[in-house]
Every structure is written in structure tokens, then in C-alpha cells.
Swiss-Prot record:
Residues 32-683 are extracellular. This is Envelope glycoprotein gp160. Residues 1-31 form the signal peptide. Residues 661-682 are annotated as: MPER. The gene is env. It comes from Human immunodeficiency virus type 1 group M subtype D (isolate Z6) (HIV-1). HAMAP family: HIV_ENV. Residues 459-470, 462-470 are annotated as: V5.
Amino acid sequence: MRAREIERNCPNLWKWGIMLLGILMICSAADNLWVTVYYGVPVWKEATTTLFCASDAKSYKTEAHNIWATHACVPTDPNPQEIELENVTENFNMWRNNMVEQIHEDIISLWDQSLKPCVKLTPLCVTLNCTDESDEWMGNVTGKNVTEDIRMKNCSFNITTVVRDKTKQVHALFYRLDIVPIDNDNSTNSTNYRLINCNTSAITQACPKVSFEPIPIHYCAPAGFAILKCRDKRFNGTGPCTNVSTVQCTHGIRPVVSTQLLLNGSLAEEEIIIRSENLTNNAKIIIVQLNESVAINCTRPYKNTRQSTPIGLGQALYTTRGRTKIIGQAHCNISKEDWNKTLQRVAIKLGNLLNKTTIIFKPSSGGDAEITTHSFNCGGEFFYCNTSGLFNSTWNINNSEGANSTESDNKLITLQCRIKQIINMWQGVGKAMYAPPIEGQINCSSNITGLLLTRDGGTNNSSNETFRPGGGDMRDNWRSELYKYKVVKIEPLGVAPTKAKRRVVEREKRAIGLGAMFLGFLGAAGSTMGAASVTLTVQARQLMSGIVQQQNNLLRAIEAQQHLLQLTVWGIKQLQARILAVERYLKDQQLLGIWGCSGKLICTTTVPWNSSWSNRSLNDIWQNMTWMEWEREIDNYTGLIYRLIEESQTQQEKNEQELLELDKWASLWNWFNITQWLWYIKIFIMIVGGLIGLRIVFAVLSLVNRVRQGYSPLSFQTLLPAPREPDRPEGIEEEGGERGRDRSIRLVNGFSALIWDDLRNLCLFSYHRLRDLILIAARIVELLGRRGWEALKYLWNLLQYWSRELRNSASSLLDTIAIAVAEGTDRVIEIVRRTYRAVLNVPTRIRQGLERLLL
């Protein structure tokens, strides 16, 4: 009643209160944020993984074997994808790049594997009786120093034949650089020699059909990973890069093993680039990438003939049998103009970086032949070329002119080269290789695309700086090509706050998930989170293609090398990449399954978003941030969020299990089913609607009937006296009596009030009828209960009576049976006893009978 009084007195206050309460409820509901899982977001993290190779080996040279074993690589993509990532800045570091270590290990493995089936030259570590090669082969070559470099020794030595206790003497030609006098006797009259590496390294002869020609190798990332590429034209190898793209494979990298000069690599697109881990540290190598290549043409003008010398069962040593007349030493030619122009640009660049005015280039300061010379492979022979003619000049940065150059005025710079057959392996200490001689004349042309330099040390504060050629660590050769790449791991799972909360409904059926991550969708990496989430469907459809394509590549690679009955390092990497891709896919699908999000791109959860993880507003997150920025912000809380989602899903599944366990009562309490309740509600609404309709119809009929009888209905504003109770006195003049609170009532104030009053009366009527019905039902239940209780007591008494009667009858029956059995038993015993006595008395009766006969 007090509520109705407040409603009548303060209607506006009542309305505003209800409105304010609704607004508070809406605001409180809107402030709740929930964790939502997104699958297929463009997010990556730095990682190290197994890369596989792609190559077009068949298009270069058809041969049975090459040292790079590229026939085990997958074919290159004729239309490679490169997707530019807008608004993305990524840090690169060429000096801490695992791709360099990986290619280094792969090339070492390929070299070692190519030499495994080849002949070991351990039996050749014997005394060699050598004499100088005949002068008739020297031709027009003059000069003692030159002839000593190219002169060969004619050596004879004893080897074991097929019969191991037999030896025979054979002859072979060796380069002077490949043998040393025994007992360190360096005199020219010495005749006893040995191979140079016999006391330090194990020597293996390269197989005669193995080729050292470098073939471009593309390194590719497996599914679930991607290769980021820096496209800045002046990128120095370290630091942030603002022009980033994603590729599946690198460009074709030629595994050229060389020192001092980088051959057949990639060129800088604009100006010369100087790269060093620390330019002020003279112990660090300096890699120079040229913007214009310099041609270098090398030749061995004389021709060799090769012979096969058996050195044991199934083994042969390939040596030089003879040579044509030598018309010149092995050498390389470089255009003087092109080289000086290139060296001038390099000097200017170095001077500007080091703030020096004079740059000096000098030859190598000493060391092994591989370091002091430009060593490389030319047509199967290993050349060691003297580069003092290249690095012997001084450049003034101010006038950009060379000074104190010792070069002649010839248009070509000629580098004198020596050839060695016993090679110190660059893979490590203690390994050497014997390269069989190549028949015929040798010519090769290459392009100088880079330099490897070292800076002289000291505390010299002058304006001069001295640089020398360096090299020897093949990792620097690979860095010169891989400086712009890095491998990243795709993280397709992302979590972010949204206003959507998971609704717990019937247990969902788990769908088959989508495939593993591929690089195609990374194009949305620079977009905001809101824009990137719109393309999740397109992105996720590309995921499975990674594994499918990898499977096809693997099958093609295995098919290509199945005749070998073994896997090279590339085949092993193919298998590793395939397994890794499947593992990534299964890991992501396992997480989605644990979270109840299998087969979903956007999956809501019941985990509330904690503002301590990120207190940014929803609009700021989705409109101003990329997925990469968002992932970096919540990276420390990702593990916690994952655990909360898992716990929430576990609790939800427990609740669903308990709910499903209640279904076994459906056969007994089917009317408790929600569908049945909906049917009951529908029937109730129909009944109420029918009652309201009947009430309206009856009211209209009553009104029409009264009008026909000449009755005018009262005004809606007429106050009717309310009926009084007989024991309530009417008021007196002194107002001593008590007045009733409802002496008169106002009918209605309008049509809405009429409807409301009618509905109220109908509800009261329904309430009273339902109450009476419930009371009647309760009375009936009470009577039925009482009657039932009495019936149960009657049945119980009846059951007790009959049980007692049955018990007595059973007892009587047992007694009767016992008596009958006892009597029968006595009779049987008596019969048996009499029979027994009769049998015992038979002899007595016989004796008595005989006595009577005798008497």
C-alpha cells in the first residue's frame, strides 16, 4: 500500500528512479570485458628452426654428383611470393643470425658427405723419391721464382698391391707446394719428400666425378614459420628496418668458398655498403658490398693429362701423368680501370665512416696460403692468387686520387696464381682433401661483388687508416648474402578483450580445425587489430596450404633421390621441416581444443579481462594498435591468460557433465523438461488470453443488455459508495465514529486505467480461484494421504496376519512331517532288527532240527 501511495504522490520520482536503475544496470554490464581468443592473427616471434632448400639443379649441369647435392632440394617456385608489410618495423642482426650458422653447418655436412665414399690417401703417406720436372715442359716461361711455383716433381714411391705382402713402384707428378722434404731439409738437392699434410691431417681424395661448381640454393622456411626480409637499400645489417617484407624462400645463394674477394654474390642497389659488427674494433671483419661488379677472368693455360694409379684393393689415386708445354703461369686478369674506380669508392666510404682523410690498402700481413692469397675453385682446380697487385695503393679522400700505387700502366691487373692439389679444409683443423688433376685447359670467369677487409690496429690518431684483405671464416661469406633475412615463428593464437562473453549452451560438437600457419596472411601485420580481425577467414584458409605444399615437396625430394638409398642433409631437413610443421599444427589445435575453440576463428570465453594485464581502452586497443604491438604489451601475461582459459573451460565441461547426468531422470520426470515447460507456459498464456477475451466480451454484452433495458451507465468519474460492514458505525456530527478507509472509490481515469483495473481484477480473481484450487487440491491430497495411510496400515496388518498364519502352518507342517518321519524310522529300524535276529538264529534252528532228527 505504501508503494502505491508513493506512486500516486511522486509519479515523476518513481519514473526517474526506474530509468536511473536501468542506466546503471546497462553501464555496469557494458564495463565488463572478457577474454576472446583469435586464431590466425598476424603475430610472429624470433625463432630458430630447420630450414630446407630449393634449387633448380637440373637447369645448370646434368651430372651424376655435385658436392652441393641439390638434386635433393625441392624445385624453386616459378612465381615466388613477397608480401610487403606496411607500418612494420623489425630489428635485424646479421652477426647473430642463426641462418648463417645453419648454412655453414649444411655446407660442411655436404662436403663431408661428398668425400665419404672417396678414397682415403693414408697409404700414400710414404717416402717419395722426387726429381725436378724436365725443363722441356717449361716452354717460354722465364724467371726462377715463377718456374718454382709451377714446377712439378716427378716422384716414385712404393705401394701395396692386391696381394698385401707385395709392393710395386709407381710414378706420379706432384706440385711443389703439395710436398715437403723429409726432416725439414729444404735444400734444392733433397730427393726424399712426403705429402705436406701427412703429419697433421687425414687426407681424402675427392671423387673424380664430383663437381665443385656452385649452384644457387634457396633457403626456405617450413610451414608455421616465415622469413622476414629487409628491403632498405642502405641497410647495414644491424638495427631497425622500416621496409620489411615476408618471403617463403631466400634468393639463390651460391655457396662460393673463397677468401679476400667475394665472388658471384648480390650487389648493393644504390651505394657501396660497409658492414661490420664493430667498425672501431680492428679484430672484427669488414664486409664490403659493391654496387657494381668487377669481372675477374682466370685461366690455367697449359693442359694436364691424368692417370689412375692403383693403391690397393678397389682404390685408385688420380695423378698428373704429363703436361703440354707451359706457355704461361696460371693467372687471373682484372680491369685496372674498373678496379681502381671500385677501390676509390670503397676508400671514400671507409674514410667517411671512420672520419679519416687517407685510406691505405696493403697486402695481407701473413698466415696460411688460404688467408694471404685469394683462394677459390676454378673449374675443379684450387687457385691461390697473389692479390698484392690489388691491395697496394693509397687514397686521399679529399681529392679522391690514388697515390703511391705500385701498379704499372697496363690496362689489366694480372694476379699470379698457384695451384694446389692438397687443400686444407676450411671446415676445421685436421682435415685435408686431395683434388684430382683436371685434364685440359681451364678457364673461368667470375664477378667480384664484395671484399673482406681487416683494419690495422694500434692507437694511431693520425688521419691515415690501413686496410688489408682478410677472410678464412666462411660464415662471413654467408653473412654477405643473408644479412637482410631473419626467421620468425608465426604465433597464430591471440587474445584480446571484448564485450562478448561465451554463453554456456548445449555441449558443442568439436569440428575439425584448420591447417598450420603459412606466410600469406602476414600482409595484415601492419593493420590495426580491428582491421586485421576482419580478414581472419581469408587468412585462416591459407593455413593448411603450408603443410600440403610441404608434403608435396617432400615426396618429390624423396622420389628424386630414392635411387641413392640414402638421404643427404637436404633430405633430412625436408623430413625435419615436415615433422616440425605437423608439430606446430597439432600444438595449436591442442590448445584450441583444450579451450573449447576447435574450428573457430573467433572464440569467446568466460574469463573476465583483468585491467592489470592492460588498462587501455577498448577503442584504443582495436583502432590504434597492431597485433604485434598488442602482443608485445601482454606478452608477460599470455601464459596466465592461457591457464585461466583452460581452467574456465575445464569447469564448464564439468558443469556440462553434471547437467548431462541429469538426463537419466528424463524418463521419470519428463514433464520437467524445458520443452515441456515452454508448452505449459504457452498453454497458460492462451488461458489467460482467453479469460481476458471472455471478460471483455461479457462486459460488452452486459453493457449492451443494460442499455437495451433503458439503463444509462454511470460516468467513469462517479464516486460510488463502498459497502460497509454491519458492525462499523456511521460517523456522527462530532466525528466520533470511525469512517471506513474506502467509503467510495473512483472507477477509472481513462482507457489505460480501465485496462489496468480490469487486468488487476482478473489477476485477483485468478489468484483467488487458484488459491481455492490449491486449497482443494491440498485437501484432496490430505484426504488421499490419510486414506492411503489407513490403507497402508490395513495392508500391513493383513500382511502381518497372513505371515503369522503362514508361519504357524509351516510350523505345523514341519511337526507333522517330523512325527511321520520318526514313526516310519522306528518301524524300519524294528524290521531291520527282527530280520537281523532271524538271520542270527538260522544256525540255531538248524542245529535244533538236526538234534530232533537224531533223537
